[in-house]
């Protein structure tokens, strides 16, 4: 005996006129005399199942009446095309097998507060919009990895437990590590993926990263996922060109394959359709001038002194001036990570860039050319107040066959928020971890 279905809702069009068995959960139910209308979801889609009392046994009709929201069941019936039905097909039911009758479902078709929904996140992800968001997230991840694989990149997995910081020491999660001292949850896989790059040439890592930032903004999570490519012999300009192609390919893939989910979210796709290379580029200095001239256009946006980093309002302002993602490049070295290559024409700035998404979504990618001179790297590590002994293996990469190289990291959740058009990053990951949120 098997409980597996003989068809899925997403492929129901291939079974028109056939009798199939679906397995899933009840989304909605309406009773009208001798008719019971059941909307069933199976994870791949939703279909309306029609139970007509005259065509089924009393036991089957009673089972239909007994079903509640989120009850699990197997429903057998004939597939019938109907232009009026959701998805264009209905199921004329002839048998129902109840697996479980669910008690009253906590999430009702009414307005619920954010805290309530987050407390019930394990159930909220079943709703149509959350389902669509997470489908888009999954498509972005698949598109990113498949595109990189097609370009000759090798996936290179990096450790989550690390002995030292990669992005600064102020936002580390620390944990005792047996007799070896303290371990830290990885802020990025980049340092380790550089080792892989020296072996394979073109690599990427994909996994969770952790930042102990006490921030409550709509753009921040303490645990998020990053995909981080690294390329040997790539200079700064090569890195920007790679990012353009990468982001554009992902967006086009989502537009092609997840149109229904974008429609569920009522996402205006016109801004996404404009996401084709080349992306505009401005320098940090040019960004400061724009902010000085236009800061009144965005609430909370104030002029910056040279050497100050861009905040969310500044990113929103700059991105609003362009119709597609925009690079802000050549930031002051002092406000960026220690491993970034200085501009040979102007050493006080780094060969780096942030890619800002339009419509107020802010930075989705950060990248740079990396320092490849071991003496310069060691000097920068000391300047940042870090323990050189912790980074000897990283400096070693430059001692044995060092080459110029570049890479970047794209945050999956920020990219999902932008592409899906959702306001808050907490809805772009199944179970968000934030300053005041660690349940469920």
From Swiss-Prot:
Catalysed conversion reaction: tRNA(Asn) + L-asparagine + ATP = L-asparaginyl-tRNA(Asn) + AMP + diphosphate + H(+)
Presence of the UniProt keyword Ligase in the record: yes
Subcellular location field: Cytoplasm
Source organism, top-level taxon: Bacteria
One CC-aspect GO term: cytoplasm
Enzyme Commission number: 6.1.1.22
GO function term, MF aspect, one: asparagine-tRNA ligase activity
Coiled-coil ranges (or none): none
Pfam families registered for this protein in UniProt: tRNA-synt_2, tRNA_anti-codon
Assembly and interaction partners: Homodimer.
Sequence similarity: Belongs to the class-II aminoacyl-tRNA synthetase family.
Name assigned to this protein: Asparagine--tRNA ligase
Species whose genome carries this gene: Roseiflexus sp. (strain RS-1)
The gene coding this protein: asnS
């Amino acid at each position: 005996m098997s409980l597996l279905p003989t068809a899925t809702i997403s492929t129901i069009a291939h079974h028109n006129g056939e009798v199939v068995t679906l397995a899933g959960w009840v989304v909605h139910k309406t009773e009208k005399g001798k008719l019971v209308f059941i909307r069933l979801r199976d994870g791949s889609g939703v279909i309306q199942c029609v139970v007509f009392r005259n065509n089924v046994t009393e036991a089957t009709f009673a089972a239909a009446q007994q079903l509640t929201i989120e009850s699990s069941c197997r429903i057998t019936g004939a597939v019938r095309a109907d232009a009026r039905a959701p998805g264009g097909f209905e199921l004329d039911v002839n048998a129902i097998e109840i697996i479980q009758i669910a008690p009253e479902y906590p999430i009702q078709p009414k307005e619920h507060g954010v805290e309530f929904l987050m407390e019930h996140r394990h159930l909220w992800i079943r709703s149509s919009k959350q389902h669509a968001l997470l489908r888009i997230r999954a498509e972005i991840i698949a598109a990113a990895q498949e595109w990189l694989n097609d370009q000759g990149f090798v996936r290179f997995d990096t450790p989550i437990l690390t002995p030292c910081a990669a992005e600064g020491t102020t936002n580390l999660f620390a944990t005792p590590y047996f007799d070896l001292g303290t371990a830290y949850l990885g802020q990025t896989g980049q340092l380790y993926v550089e080792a892989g790059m020296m072996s394979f040439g073109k690599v990427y890592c994909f996994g969770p990263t952790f930042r102990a930032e006490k921030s409550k903004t709509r753009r921040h999570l303490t645990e998020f996922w990053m995909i981080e490519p690294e390329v040997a012999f790539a200079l700064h300009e090569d890195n920007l060109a790679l990012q353009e192609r990468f982001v554009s390919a992902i967006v086009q893939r989502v537009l092609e394959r997840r149109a229904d989910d974008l429609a569920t979210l009522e996402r205006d796709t016109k801004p996404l359709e404009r996401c084709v290379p080349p992306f505009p580029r401005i320098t940090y200095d040019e960004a400061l001038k724009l902010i000085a001239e236009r800061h009144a256009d965005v609430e909370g946006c104030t002029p910056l002194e040279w050497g100050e980093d861009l905040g969310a309002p500044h990113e929103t302002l700059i991105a609003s001036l362009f119709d597609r993602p925009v690079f802000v490049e050549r930031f002051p070295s002092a406000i960026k990570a220690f491993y970034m290559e200085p501009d040979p024409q102007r050493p006080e700035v780094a060969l780096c860039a942030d890619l800002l998404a339009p419509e107020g979504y802010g930075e989705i990618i950060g990248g740079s050319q990396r320092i490849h001179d071991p003496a310069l790297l060691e000097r920068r590590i000391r300047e940042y107040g870090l323990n050189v002994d912790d980074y000897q293996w990283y400096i070693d990469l430059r001692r044995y066959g060092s080459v110029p190289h570049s890479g970047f990291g794209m945050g999956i959740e920020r990219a999902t928020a932008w592409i899906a058009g959702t306001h808050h990053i907490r809805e772009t990951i199944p179970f968000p971890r934030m300053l005041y949120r660690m349940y469920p």
